[in-house]
Amino acid sequence: MNGVYIWTETTDAGHAFVSVHQDNLIYVYTYGRFGRKGPATLTGDGILNFLTGDDARLYYREELYKYQARVFQIDDVTTEETRRIFESLWNSGKTPVFTEAMGDRTKRRGKVIDVYDLTDSNCTTHTVQVIREAGTKIFDTSYISTTTQLRIDNEEDFTIPVSLQRYLTEKSGDLSSMNVMEVTSSFREQHANIEHFKPNSESLTGRVEEGLANSASTVGSSSGYSGGTIGGVLGGSYDIDE
């Protein structure tokens, strides 16, 4: 089924990424610290992996079954525009410096597009930024001020996957907003767990990172502010240690 999908998983610090289905082909765009890392691994090369074919399908199965990812279809953006934005970023990126821990997929399909910062420039902020740039209105909110009775327009901003997942889950259950639909079960039907992956358990490092990212998201998912909005808290700590 053609469409644009946001994936979220919340094991440890979690992860968020985007995939596009177009003309029976799968395109996955996943950003993270997949290469060189700075102190405590909280910063590093910001690498965008662009996966297709068997790479993309295996990544789907890993996310669905190892990390219990959830999938949300976003109906108010086009496959063409979403692909154009991500592939423009990827095409303008640089080949990463290989590291011992770097995965094969990243060596083959990764490009450095910027500097990663857990609190400021991460998988969640990139996912939201690109989908917003592609034209979605799902992150636009408004409310009536109790003091002025005027309508206040706002934009939701997210730093951590758990906040994004919570927001998309609420949106998918809101019948007045038909532009977000959870499709996790249909993806599990289409992509069986042929490797018999077991769910990953959380690690201590992941819990520490989750706490840091949580603190950077300031007042919460509906505040309109995140570490990305206010510049992050680790911006000066990027110094490659490999």
What kind of feature is each model-predicted range?
Residues 229-242:
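Long, low-complexity, intrinsically disordered segments
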Residues 145:
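Active-site cores enriched in adjacent His and Asp/Glu residues with nearby glycine-rich loops
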Residues 1-121, 133, 149-220, 224, ...:
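Non-catalytic ligand/cofactor/substrate-binding and regulatory segments of enzyme domains
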